[in-house]
Amino acid sequence: MEVAALVALTLLLGALVILVALAVVRRKEEIKEESEQAAESSAEASAAKGPTSKKQKQEKQRSRKDKPAQHSFSHPLLAASLKGHSGNVTCLDFSSNGKYLASCADDRTVRIWSTKDFLEREHKCLRANVELDHATLVRFSPDSRAFITWLSNGDAIRIFKMIKKDDGTFSFKAASEDFPQKHKAAIVNIGIAETGKFIMSASTDTTILIWDLKGEVLASINTNQMTNSYAATSPCGRFVASCGFTPDVKVWEVCFGKGGEFREVTRAFDLKGHSAGVHAFAFSNDSHRMVTVSKDGTWKLWNTNVEYKKQQDPYLLGTVPCSSSDGSRVALSPDGRVVAISDGCNVAMFDATTGNLEEELRGVHSEEITDIRFDINSRFLVCSGDKAIRVFHNAPGYRASIRDMQDMLKKAQNEAMKQRLQQQIREAQSALDTVLAAPTE
């Protein structure tokens, strides 16, 4: 009985093995047939290259169209559109020697542009990579041989040295260590004093920190403005200022001894006159003028060339209505002749003396403008908002300088002075005519 059962089991196993073998052979034949059919279909498609190929091209074209179109913009004063970033540009800064423009974006790079290429067809730039992070703010050092950045994720300052190569370009080397993390709220701005003696950083929680160049905190300032919306160092290197929820701008002097050692931070003066919080402010190149833009719908121009230690207050020179919003930025041309204010995607340019609206630049960027600046010679206005940087001719500046020289000509009594002014007026008018006649970017 047991022998019969064993024989039956053996036969059953043998039958199963045969069935499995047949199934494997059958599957191999099916796979071979499928591969041959696929090869034939591919050959036919390659030979025909007809409807299928066209359909594929149409699908590719359709996928390209589905991508958001790049924002197009043109204007008679547009000198150039600097394109190189693959992410949105968040900050701009000109070097003090006027040769370079730095830009940072959320694409983990800082780009260095040559200002002499602004009017050229091609705009080359040098790229500094921000490892494992991206910079939201960038500022040149006074000697134009380094720049500092604020790291978005690291919440710290990182210094980059610019090392000049034999071909005239630069390589970039980050400092071995970042500054320590000290701020407890979002950063609104950073800056380096033109004297090279200190670095400033300011956050929304009313804190301003004064650092030495090695990353040690020299002083902490509480602005008592409920929130800080903006802060900056003055071009002269003596002052730091802030604005925020309160309707004033507060200015402090950072004091150093004769030997260069830090002494103290003292309150210098306030700009009082707005009826609502101040969005932003800017200095002229000599720090003798300041401009403020407020939620009250006005901008104000101030004479800040005062002896504040003798309790002399700044003089209000003018109040002008304007359109602004929480993200508005303001720039004052280095010569103090033109005020530029951003509002959303638009820019308005005013004559600083008369308050007249000279130019309205609408739809400059596809997103809210993040920064706006004049170059050190007051020839160009640059702004950022999306992936591009717009460069505009400062036509209002040319007009204002011509007007100023014409006023001087009326008062001139010396013949040599008159001839010199007449020549300068002709040159300025010729430059303006060239700008207005130039083809747009």
Please annotate each region the language model reported.
Residues 82-101, 105-106:
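Beta-strand-rich domains and repeat architectures in extracellular enzymes and scaffolds
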Residues 48-74:
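Blade/loop signatures of beta-propeller domains
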Residues 104-107, 150-154, 202-205, 243-246, ...:
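Conserved strand-to-loop turn within each blade of WD40 beta-propeller repeats
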Residues 96-97, 142-143, 194-195, 235-236, ...:
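Residue-level detector of Asp-centered blade-edge/turn motifs that repeat once per structural unit
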Residues 87-93, 132-140, 184-192, 226-233, ...:
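Canonical WD40 repeat/beta-propeller blade segments in eukaryotic WD-repeat proteins
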Residues 2-38, 42, 367-368, 375-380, ...:
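Terminal intrinsically disordered, low-complexity extensions flanking WD-repeat/beta-propeller proteins
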Residues 67-77, 112-127, 152-177, 184, ...:
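Per-blade loop-tip surfaces of WD-repeat and WD-like beta-propellers in eukaryotic adaptors/scaffolds
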